Amino acid sequence: MLLNKDRFGKLTSKSLDSIAALGLREANAELPCLFRNNSIESSSKTPPEPLSPLAFELSTNLKKSASALAWNVQYFVDTYGLSNVGFLTLTFRDHVTDPKEAQRRFNSLKTNILAKRYRAYIRVMEPMKSGRIHYHLLVALHSDIRTGFDFPAVYRQDYSSANKAIRSEWSFWRKTAPKYGFGRTELMPVRSNSEGIGRYVGKYISKGIESRTEQFKGVRLVEYSRKAKSLLRASSSFLTGLMSGVANFRYSFITSRTIWAVNQLLTAYAVFSALVGRITGVILL
């Protein structure tokens, strides 16, 4: 999927709509996280609930949130390395629909396992149309889980290409997930950066619109680990300072004799902003 950005490096509305459409298509397709379970064996397949066309209607605020999340996911993957990042899906063993109960269980897992096992993570709570809750996480591992991984073969449930590191993760979650009330789990490498944005943000947009009922008001659907927050905050602070300096420099030249020069500077700043966004994956506002 080609993601288009404006001159300031932000994702365009058209790109966000495309991401939402991709999220809808994948939510209704045979995604690995919905039909395959490489951590907890399950004999039955639970088809995903179809989403209504309302999921295509993106509010301005949601577009901004999705754009920010998309950039953060991109920067996360670029920072920790594609080979060391994976998608972790956690599904409760029972039918949990209360977001407070879901978060209570997740907090226990977060404190005892996630904070110690992974370098950083981004977590999205996904309420399905039925009300059942599960979690999608982007986790940064200490080992390469991607090298040699044959994605088409794995989608056919042939796991022979999986390396030792990812097999170790699968084994770990088979033993650990039930202790925290989780059943079916899955950890998969990220196939590509654009796919990562499409799958992760597409799910957030489509399911967020469809399933944000009264009981989910005030519930944080997206959460960043402490290390992920520090990483993104440091990058944002640096670029904000850089942007401020450029802006001050720009406005200091506004006089009756330098209108043409200011216009040239504005053009240069737009190009500069887009370049910084392309290199770092962080939006200059």
From Swiss-Prot:
Entry keywords, A to Z: DNA replication, DNA-binding
Pfam family, one: REP_ORF2-G2P
Role noted for this protein: Essential for autonomous replication of the phasyl DNA replicon.
A GO molecular-function annotation: DNA binding
Record-linked InterPro entries: ORF2/G2P_dom (IPR056906)
Any one biological process term the GO annotation gives: DNA replication
Protein name: Phasyl DNA replicon protein arp
